[in-house]
Structures are given as C-alpha cells and as structure tokens.
Curated annotation (Swiss-Prot):
Its cofactor is FAD. It comes from Jannaschia sp. (strain CCS1). Keywords: Cytoplasm, FAD, Flavoprotein, Methyltransferase, NAD, NADP, Transferase, tRNA processing. FAD binds at G11, G12, G13, M14, A15, G16. GO terms for cellular component: cytosol. The lineage of its organism: Bacteria, Pseudomonadati, Pseudomonadota, Alphaproteobacteria, Rhodobacterales. It catalyses: uridine(54) in tRNA + (6R)-5,10-methylene-5,6,7,8-tetrahydrofolate + NADH + H(+) = 5-methyluridine(54) in tRNA + (6S)-5,6,7,8-tetrahydrofolate + NAD(+); uridine(54) in tRNA + (6R)-5,10-methylene-5,6,7,8-tetrahydrofolate + NADPH + H(+) = 5-methyluridine(54) in tRNA + (6S)-5,6,7,8-tetrahydrofolate + NADP(+). This is Methylenetetrahydrofolate--tRNA-(uracil-5-)-methyltransferase TrmFO.
Length: 458
C-alpha cells in the first residue's frame, strides 16, 4: 500500500475515534463514518463522537496496582485522544477517573473534525467494504444490516448479550438530611475527591423490602428469539438480586469504608452510592444500578431508597442489545478478519468490555492499519503489556467455544516468575506486572515516533 491510500473507519465511538486519531497522527488520510445522528440508537442521545452511554467512569487510574489504570498509562504514553480529553474533563471520583460525559464527547468530536488528515461523514454503512483498508468499530449497537453482513461473512451467528444502563438523578432532589458525601475509605488527595460520592444508608428491614420490590418489579421483556446473556461487569441489579438476597450487599450496595455523619454510631446494613455525572455537580448516576425494570417500576422501587424518596430522574435506566464477534476464531493477531484481511475490527464488537478497553483496541488497530498503509512493519506487541495481554486474549488466548466479553485484568498477563502467590503477595505481584508492562510498552512504542512523520496529540 502507499501513503496516499485512505483508511476507512466505520463507527465513531471510543474505538473508532481513537483509531482515527492514531492513524491520522501517523500521516494517514482517514475517512471516519458515523451513522448518528442520521440513524439513532436506543442508548445514544447525541450525534457526538465518543459518546458515553452507560457509566461515566473510566474506573481506576492507579497504574501501579490496577490493570485498567495501567491501560490508562499506556494510552497516555501513546498520545491517546480519549485519555487526554478525559483528563481535561475529569470529575472528582476518589481513586477513579470519572468524566463529564457531554463536554468530553464534544471535545473529542471537535478535535477529530479539526484534524487535517481526518474526513468525517455521517450515514449508515450496510455492507462490508469489498476493498481498501478498513476498521470496523461499530460497537455494541451495530446496525442490523451491517451486523447481518458480518454474520454472513463469518459463517456463523454473531454472539449477543445485553447491556443495562444506570439511571441518573438530579442532585437537588436528593435528601441530604439522610444522605451524605463521602468516598469509600475517604479515598482521594483533596476534600472534593474524598467527598465525591453521595451515600444513601439502608437498615436491614429497608434492604429486605428493597430486595423484595426488585424481585417482584415489572421488567422489560425480550423480543422473540432473543435470550438474555449478560456480561458480569454490567449485570442489572434485579438479576444480581435473583442470584441471592445478599448479593447486592456484597456488591454495589456494600456498606464498608463509610461513616454516616448523621448517625456515626450506627453502621448501615447496606449503602446505595451515587457518583457525580457532570462538572456542575447537578447530575448523579446510581453506581452499579443498571436495570431492565420498566420506567414505572423504577420510580416506585428507587423511591424506597432513603434519600431518594423524592428523587427526580434526568434519565431512567434501560437495556439494549450488545453484539460481538467470536474474535478468537475470526481475527488474526493483527486484528484482521482472516477471510478478508483488508478489514480490521476494533472496540467492543471484538469482545472487550469497557470504555478504556474499547478505545485501546482502537488505538492498536489504528496504528497497525497505518503501519500497513505506510509499508512499515510494527514489532510484535508484548503480551506483558496491558494492551498486548488484551489483544492476545481476544485473538487467540481465549477459548473460542466459551468466548465472552472481557475487561482487562492481571489474569490475562503472563506470570512474573519468583513472586509469592496468594493475597499476601498481591501488592508486590501487581507492581511487578505494571513495572514490566511499562518498560515493554515504552520499548514497543519508541521506534514508532518517526513512523510516517507522526504528529503529537493536541
């Protein structure tokens, strides 16, 4: 291929936006196609690129003890537009990186529109391109026509599961005579970070009544032929409750690390947490409360939570279908479709789960495609890095027969020899993983600084 060859990227979510940015910064001309706002989806509200539709959290930012924090570090080192923009629109969230979602998406959109090597067009793509380097990053809400085309080419049905979306509450409707502000274990370097969450306490009787209401509430029904397979990291709360009455109390409603200033001598039996959803602090999402309850049921059930008895909702929860391909069967180690190697896949459609994981796969696909167009060969990506471990998992490390969406985690990394196992050795083990990864990532990335006369991120 030649440097004049254009790269087509279908889908302007986290992965597609990152792929476009990376390839364009390496000197490749990119055409980015996004179907919104011409074709809308259930979950999206705008036509912005990189719109966040579920949580507003990029999760832990700890690059020494957490695999997703390490992924943040690797992406920042590679001039990620998603990470740089997230850093510019961060919200207090203790040790996590939470983002003001609308200004974030608007900023990513503006940066990509302003890039001289990126052309953005809007409209639906309904078939696989017959030729030309292409990245498909259409995400969990891939249009039905394109999904059918992918399924025909793959020779198998696309796998499917369902994502649920958490509700968002107006802050001024929360009863702060009952609720209080505190991050778990007072995490954070500033008072604002240490008070990043609003907490609503429940007694045992209130918790039991809440569980009863969850289990009996009206739920959204699936269409004929659809079955409910859920990713464990985004389970609806009522599905968690069905797994056991105490499941929520040891999950999103765990009461640990919190002290109620209204009644410091009494330990709550369970706690519902809300996390700031915008910079103004006027909106809060209910952490871990993805749901498929009907809208009417949500209003009734959530009003049972002390502090939310008069809550007003900016958005109620919902459920949407999430499709992904069997990547270990269909993709090679360069993320190319084996049967049509001019096509790469990236993002959530490949079977990674999470905003950052999706964007990171876009980062890799964009760099791999750009190198190919420029006639260069990238060195093999070490599986000791977070991105290397993740792409190795989806392109062959996982069992194709049981393949399910995966967050990045240290279980995907090759072991570091000579380290103590078990809980007691965990801190040293994780630090060894991240030190090794950072060195390997730097070594892999450094030779690419001159690739195509690459440009720095804004």
């Amino acid at each position: 291929m030649t440097q004049n060859t254009q790269l087509t990227i279908i889908g302007g979510g986290m992965a597609g936006s990152e792929a476009a940015w990376q390839a364009a910064n390496l000197g490749v001309n990119v055409r980015l196609i996004e179907m919104r706002p011409k074709v809308e989806t259930f979950a999206h509200r705008t036509g912005n690129l990189a719109e966040m539709v579920c949580s507003n959290s990029f999760r832990s930012d700890d690059s020494e003890q957490n695999a997703v924090g390490l992924l943040h570090w690797e992406m920042r080192a590679a001039n990620s537009v998603i990470m740089h923009t997230a850093d510019s629109h961060k919200l207090p969230a203790g040790g996590a990186l939470a983002v003001d979602r609308d200004p974030f998406a608007e900023a990513v959109t503006a940066k990509l529109h302003a890039h001289p090597n990126i052309e953005i067009t809007y409209g639906e793509v309904t078939d696989l391109p017959a030729a030309g380097p292409t990245i498909i990053a259409t995400g969990p809400l891939t249009g039905s026509a394109l999904a059918d085309a992918i399924a025909r080419e793959a020779g198998q049905d696309a796998l499917a599961f369902f994502d649920a979306i958490a509700p968002i509450v107006y802050a001024d409707s929360i009863d702060m005579d009952i609720a209080w502000r505190q991050s778990r274990y007072d995490k954070g370097d500033t008072l604002e970070e240490q008070q990043a969450y609003i907490n609503c306490p429940l007694t045992r009787d209130q918790y039991e009544a809440f569980i009863d209401a969850l289990l009996s509430a009206d739920k959204t029904q699936f269409k004929d032929g659809e079955t409910a397979g859920y990713f464990d990291g985004c389970l609806p709360i009522e599905v968690m409750a069905e797994r056991g009455r105490e499941t929520l109390r040891f999950g999103p409603m765990k009461p640990v690390g919190l002290t109620n200033p209204h009644d410091p001598q009494t330990k709550a039996y369970a706690v519902v947490q809300l996390r700031r959803d915008n910079a103004l602090g006027t909106l809060y999402n209910i952490v871990g409360f993805q749901t498929k309850m009907t809208y009417g049921a949500q209003k009734q059930v959530f009003a049972m939570i002390p502090g939310l008895q008069e809550a007003s909702f900016a958005r109620l929860g919902g459920i949407h279908r999430n499709t992904f391909i069997n990547s270990p069967t269909l993709l090679d180690d360069q993320m190319r479709l084996r049967s049509k190697p001019h096509i790469r896949f990236a993002g959530q459609i490949t079977g990674v789960e999470g905003y950052v994981e999706s964007a990171s796969m876009g980062l890799l696909a964009g760099r791999m495609a750009a190198a190919e167009i420029l006639g260069e060969t990238l060195p093999d990506l070490p599986d000791t890095t977070a991105m290397g471990a993740l792409v190795t998992h989806i392109t062959g490390g996982a069992d194709a027969k049981t393949f399910q969406p995966m967050n990045v985690n240290f279980g995907l990394f090759p072991p570091v020899e000579g380290l103590k196992g078990g809980r007691r050795g965990r801190k040293d083990r994780y630090k060894a993983y991240t030190d090794r990864a950072k060195a390997a990532w730097t070594n892999w990335l450094t030779p690419q600084t001159s690739l195509g006369g690459s440009q720095a991120a804004e």
